Amino acid sequence: AQAQATDFDYDNCASELLAAGIAPDAAAAACAMSYRPTEISSCVSGVLNASAVLPESALVACSRDRRPDEVATCVSNIHADLVVNDSEMVLEHCHRTILPERYAACVVGIANEVDYTTEDSLTTCIAAGYKPLDIEPSYIPLD
């Protein structure tokens, strides 16, 4: 039998979110709005297991991200490898980045090699986006 392209496991999603301390109405809404509900609940569980954030914060980040599994991995990797004073900041940055796993690698690598604090590495890596140079055509006159 072929595996389904999506998971429709809304009961497990709700059960995991309730066990994580999410209010029943919030758990029901988050699972109901999700295309892949267990990705949301797994993300929340992963974030809560790795960090000291509020369950509601984890739910907001996980349910509003295109890659909830990577958000949990990002938070987990940063907490495993670095001293973290502000878990909420780590969660916020892992949620804000487009590629959470790559972002975590940047944060850990910069912190370890440049001797930055975790907070400095979070800020440096989130600001290190792609900046194209010498884009043609230029709208500046070449007089």
Model segments located where?
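General marker for long, soluble alpha-helical cores
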Residues: 2-143
